[in-house]
């Protein structure tokens, strides 16, 4: 094979992926789709530029226009999230968490996070960014019935451990965390309160779910490509939570600590997404939550065991389903079958699963944010639930269901809640 043929093959696979994705029902809770305007920014000449440091205080020349875009971004993000500071330089949510752990913690300091099985993100773990900083990781007590942090036990834990940092948020996140209840206790013992909003940033922007910075969080970290429908990247939003020296340590941890150049084409895409969310975010977030609830209810009616019935199933973009009663391999069996039918989601540990079941966990994690952005509403959620029933409960051939999924998805090819297409119109 010639090198040109390698080039052609790569471009072919990209084209095939884009075609395939546009004909599937993507329910991965950590993904989304960007608007044409954002795509233009990400594919721009900003990808060739390097910038280090703050706008107007760069270590490289030639940043005149980059600086203007980043300053607009700081203005829009602080307005959107009512924060005192917005740092667009982290290149991912994990990178943002890494900066916070390195900026505010020292090796041996205690941090309380959500356990992986309970929905905590890997960057919070001893084997992730927290552990890399040398932090002593403790996990929140968890209440299986409410699918949330146990407030009474957590309050006791904070007082006993006197941690340096407490972290709310995670990757399995159907219900708001008790920030309002526990932040005052954390501050009594001198802890910094961090909220990992990676999954729910777009919901927070639209006034749904919860408002961490008003409920007591000092710092909010996030990725920018889940319910916040931007390019892959990160952001740190925070209040004037400490003295200038402490805030300077956080900023120093970002650059030169864990970020050099901050991928300026993605930064520009984040800025346009912030403008889209200021214009359309309220409507988008509201419809995401409506769709998640509608999908959860429809799945329950179809015979699935949906988690959180007593709490209304979900208050976020996520729907959690226990499929262990359908097959011993649970999500490890269900997710590949659904992929054959053109329904893309991921297997997921549930709080009662041991870590050893990571490849055959009980659950499926479902997110509706991308299908909401292409214009789907509550009625479409019922159809999706029925497709899933046909594959997993009725044991219909996934290839047969795939044909129906293909034609169903053909009707939803525009990216709404954007300046390109505006709001979807319900017929």
Swiss-Prot record:
Principal location: cytoplasm
Site feature (Plays an important role in substrate specificity) residues: 225
Enzyme class: transferase
Pathway(s) it belongs to: Amino-acid biosynthesis; glycine biosynthesis; glycine from L-serine: step 1/1
Enzyme Commission number(s) from the entry: 2.1.2.-
Gene3D superfamilies: Aspartate Aminotransferase, domain 1 (3.90.1150.10), Type I PLP-dependent aspartate aminotransferase-like (Major domain) (3.40.640.10)
InterPro entries in UniProt: PyrdxlP-dep_Trfase, PyrdxlP-dep_Trfase_major, PyrdxlP-dep_Trfase_small, Ser_HO-MeTrfase, Ser_HO-MeTrfase-like, Ser_HO-MeTrfase_PLP_BS, SHMT-like_dom
Entry's Gene Ontology molecular function annotations: glycine hydroxymethyltransferase activity; pyridoxal phosphate binding
Any one GO BP annotation for this protein: glycine biosynthetic process from serine
SUPFAM superfamilies: PLP-dependent transferases
Modified residues (N6-(pyridoxal phosphate)lysine): 226
Superkingdom of the organism of origin: Archaea
Keyword list, A-Z: Amino-acid biosynthesis, Cytoplasm, One-carbon metabolism, Pyridoxal phosphate, Transferase
Cellular location(s): Cytoplasm
General function of this protein: Catalyzes the reversible interconversion of serine and glycine with a modified folate serving as the one-carbon carrier. Also exhibits a pteridine-independent aldolase activity toward beta-hydroxyamino acids, producing glycine and aldehydes, via a retro-aldol mechanism.
Assigned protein family: Belongs to the SHMT family.
Subunit structure of this chain's protein: Homodimer.
Listed name of the protein: Serine hydroxymethyltransferase
Gene giving rise to this polypeptide: glyA
């Amino acid at each position: 094979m010639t090198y040109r043929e390698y080039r052609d093959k790569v471009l072919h696979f990209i084209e095939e992926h884009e075609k395939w994705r546009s004909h599937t029902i993507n329910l991965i809770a950590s993904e989304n789709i960007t608007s044409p305007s954002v795509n233009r920014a990400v594919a721009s000449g900003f990808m060739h530029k390097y910038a280090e440091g703050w706008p107007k205080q760069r270590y490289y020349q030639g940043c005149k226009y980059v600086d203007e875009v980043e300053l607009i971004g700081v203005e829009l993000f602080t307005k959107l999230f009512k924060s005192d500071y917005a740092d667009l330089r982290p290149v991912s949510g994990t990178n943002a968490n890494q900066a916070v752990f390195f900026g505010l913690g020292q090796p041996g300091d205690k941090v309380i996070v959500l356990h992986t099985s309970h929905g905590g993100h890997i960057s919070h773990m001893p084997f992730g960014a927290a552990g890399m900083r040398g932090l002593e990781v403790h996990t929140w007590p968890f209440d299986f019935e409410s699918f949330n942090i146990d407030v009474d036990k957590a309050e006791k834990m904070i007082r006993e451990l006197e941690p340096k940092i407490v972290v709310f948020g995670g990757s399995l996140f159907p219900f708001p965390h008790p920030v309002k209840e526990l932040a005052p206790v954390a501050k009594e013992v001198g802890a910094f309160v961090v909220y990992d909003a990676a999954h729910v940033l777009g919901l927070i922007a639209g006034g749904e779910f919860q408002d961490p910075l008003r409920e007591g969080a000092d710092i909010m970290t996030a990725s920018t490509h889940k319910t916040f429908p931007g390019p892959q990247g990160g952001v740190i939003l925070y209040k004037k939570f400490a003295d200038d020296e402490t805030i300077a340590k956080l900023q120093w941890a970002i650059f030169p600590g864990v970020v050099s150049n901050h991928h300026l084409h993605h930064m520009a895409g984040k800025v346009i997404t912030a403008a889209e969310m200021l214009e359309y975010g309220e409507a988008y977030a509201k419809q995401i939550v409506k769709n998640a609830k509608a999908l959860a209810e429809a799945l329950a009616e179809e015979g699935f065991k949906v988690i959180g019935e007593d709490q209304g199933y979900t208050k976020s973009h996520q729907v959690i389903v226990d499929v262990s009663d359908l097959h011993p391999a649970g999500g490890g069996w269900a997710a590949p079958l659904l992929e054959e039918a053109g329904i893309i989601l991921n297997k997921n540990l549930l709080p009662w699963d041991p870590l050893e079941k990571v490849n055959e966990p009980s659950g499926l994690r479902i997110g509706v944010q991308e299908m909401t952005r292409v214009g789907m509403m509550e009625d479409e959620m019922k159809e999706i639930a029925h497709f899933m029933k046909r594959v997993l409960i009725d044991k219909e051939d996934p290839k047969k269901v795939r044909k129906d999924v293909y034609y169903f998805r053909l009707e939803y090819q525009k990216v709404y809640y954007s300046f390109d297409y505006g709001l979807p119109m319900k017929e």
